[in-house]
Amino acid sequence: MKKIRLFIPLIIALFAVLSFAPTALAFCGFYVAKADTKLYNQASQVVMARDGNKTVLTMANDFQGDVKDFAVVVPVPTVIKEEQVRVAQPNIVERLDAFSAPRLVEYFDEDPCSPQIRPQSMLAPTAAARGGSSEEKAMADNSLGVTVEARFNVGEYDILILSAKESNGLETWLNRNGYKIPRGANQLLKPYIRSSMKFFVAKVNLDKFEESGYQFLRPLQIAYESPKFMLPIRLGMINANIEQDLIVYILSPQGQAEVTNYRTVKIPSNMNIPVFVKNEFGDFYKSMFQTFYTKEDKKVAFLEYAWDMGNCDPCSAQPLNTEELKQAGVFWLDNNGNNNNRIAPGFGFPFSNNNVYITRLHVRYTRNKFPEDLMFQTTSNRESFQGRYVLQHPFTGNLQCSAGREYKRSLSRRFEQEAQTLAQLTNWNIQNIRQKMKLTVGNISTSWWENFLMFLGL
């Protein structure tokens, strides 16, 4: 039996994983590094392409273990038919992650004794089923208040759409049919049943998985129509004893998306920090996120990126092209500019225009701080925002002029400000920061006679 690690992290928050396996000016400057989801061991990712009441939801996975043990249960707002489900390209979530990740940029000071005319803007280079007759099973299902609304196969997945009258019956049905429910599922299933939601249940078809040749399970993509713009995160909390990270990419033709039942807060951005952070950017961003997550009482959604998908400045990765946007679920694209009746591949939604605005939201949640599912709304706000952190390298050549001596004198104040900023952002020890800065930039200091010449204005 193949043992795998799924290629793209799964939205643990959205799924109950039922298995034995262990449980994933302009913005110009030179792009250096990004803080992508690889920083978080259990980072879950979901893509929501939404226009009006129409949504295409792409779900990715970080399940580890035998594929025969993998299964997910996802609350959905309506009955899902076979034509509304497909498997997505495995790299599409990674592309969105790379494009929208918080990024580190760097600048290099010019020679103050030989100033150059700086262009106003500069684009950065890119970073690169069990036995028994069907009649018997139907009778047993009905006695539990569970109805199988649909049953089909998509790619390497066998999929069921269930409705239920009460949570005990659904829990019993799932256990009888080989889905091992974690303790506590009963109480968390109740609110979804009361809300008349359905349950999307998927497990791996081993024969089809072997035939596919893939070494990982591909993301599942679901298209549906509902006024509810939400993610049901509560069910997934059954599996987690620790804080979980959820990254939500919302694609919209309108503008920024936000969480409505919790505050949406911008991640700190546009800060100058010491140049040694270039080699420690992952540690820096994790520490900074934890610091502000704690300051906000651990119950906010952080905005990490909001931008028109057609451009970026600086670019941590190339913007997604038209085909990639379609793979991400965008169904309102119109390549020809005047054909509004084309159909999104695999789904029944027509294209309408080519606006795509991306919002990246980062939620770190626990059951006590996030007792409700996430509710969203899109807005008309098209303001650009990114988590962006700046390295400003000092000029280290000869400074044999008055402007050079003044520049050199100013560096100590600048370095101290960068150290203080880093300490405030991360709660790192200020003395350790200062020591690392000395090792990085060397001993750039002014002598007594240079200070005297500056005092004389020379």
Task: Pin down the residues of each PLM region.
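Bacterial N-terminal signal peptides that target proteins for export
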Residues: 1-11
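Cleavable N-terminal signal peptides
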Residues: 13-14, 24
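Sec/Tat signal peptide C-region and signal peptidase I cleavage site
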Residues: 20-26
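Accessory, solvent-exposed terminal regions and/or long lumenal/extracellular loops of proteins
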Residues: 29-39, 126, 181-421, 425, ...
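A cross-kingdom signal targeting lumenal/periplasmic-facing segments of multi-pass membrane
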Residues: 86-154, 334-345, 350-352
